[in-house]
UniProtKB/Swiss-Prot annotation:
The active site is at C127 (cysteine sulfenic acid (-soh) intermediate). The gene is Prdx4. GO terms for biological process: cell redox homeostasis; extracellular matrix organization; male gonad development; negative regulation of male germ cell proliferation; protein maturation; reactive oxygen species metabolic process; response to oxidative stress; spermatogenesis. It comes from the Eukaryota. One of its GO terms (cellular component) is cytosol. This is Peroxiredoxin-4. PROSITE patterns: THIOREDOXIN_2. The lineage of its organism: Eukaryota, Metazoa, Chordata, Craniata, Vertebrata.
């Protein structure tokens, strides 16, 4: 009888523990599920952070030594309206031309090729070297029915002050190409070169043909300027293909061999080359 009583007591105690475990299991499972979910969210967040980071801009800001990683959300490259072989985004604004303020728009250049380039800011370092280089060789562009316009987010008043600053003091001096003002940043955003975190643009260069179609895009990080020689070569190459229908191989220059773009025609070029 005593043994039976002990057995019953043990069974009762076991049942009590079982009931307690049953009551404890749901909160425990919920805790484990929440922990796993939080770990998954942290992993997803780390992935999204890496995904949203763009390449490292060596120059960071306009000033050397301020390098920083720029996220995709901080510039408008992914929102650009500028598409190769499509009409260039329309723009209009106030420019400084021969020391005067004048209204300028993209359609003013219909019937001509246009080299339209952005630079970060007035009164900086690489920027004046580029503008002066293009301005000093403007006649070479004009001789091939091409104009050049430079643009930044500075006001037309800042442009004029920079032009009135002697070159030996970092100014432009008399300049032979228009400086367009994009004070509200709309043009820069449309062309995908505006850096939201910095408040200025990358070094973007766009070649627009005589029909208003965008033919070429160059985007430089901030520390390195662009080449006038290469820009001239590209304009000449596109004009050649427009006129003759043949295509230009790597490094093509006026007078060099071109390629007839069909299976039989290309063999003439490769036979000469090899």
């Amino acid at each position: 009888m005593e043994a039976r009583s002990k057995l019953l007591d043990g069974t009762t105690a076991s049942r009590r523990w079982t009931r307690k475990l049953v009551l404890l299991l749901p909160p425990l499972l919920l805790f484990l599920l929440r922990t796993e979910s939080l770990q998954g969210l942290e992993s997803d967040e780390r992935f999204r952070t890496r995904e949203n980071e763009c390449h490292f801009y060596a120059g960071g800001q306009v000033y050397p030594g301020e390098a920083s990683r720029v996220s995709v959300a901080d510039h408008s490259l992914h929102l650009s309206k500028a598409k190769i072989s499509k009409p260039a985004p329309y723009w209009e604004g106030t420019a400084v031309i021969n020391g005067e303020f004048k209204e300028l728009k993209l359609t003013d250049y219909r019937g001509k090729y246009l080299v339209f380039f952005f630079y970060p800011l007035d009164f900086t370092f690489v920027c004046p070297t580029e503008i002066i280089a293009f301005g000093d060789r403007i006649e070479e562009f004009k001789s091939i029915n091409t104009e050049v316009v430079a643009c930044s987010v500075d006001s037309q008043f800042t442009h004029l002050a920079w032009i009135n600053t002697p070159r030996r003091q970092g100014g432009l001096g008399p300049i032979r190409i228009p400086l367009l003002s994009d004070l509200n940043h709309q043009i820069s955003k449309d062309y995908g070169v505006y850096l939201e975190d910095s408040g200025h643009t990358l070094r973007g260069l766009f070649i627009i043909d005589d029909k208003g179609v965008l033919r070429q895009i160059t985007l430089n990080d901030l520390p390195v300027g662009r080449s006038v020689d290469e820009t001239l070569r590209l304009v000449q190459a596109f004009q050649y293909t427009d006129k003759h229908g043949e295509v230009c191989p790597a490094g093509w220059k006026p007078g060099s061999e071109t390629i007839i773009p069909d299976p039989a025609g290309k063999l003439k070029y490769f036979d000469k080359l090899n």
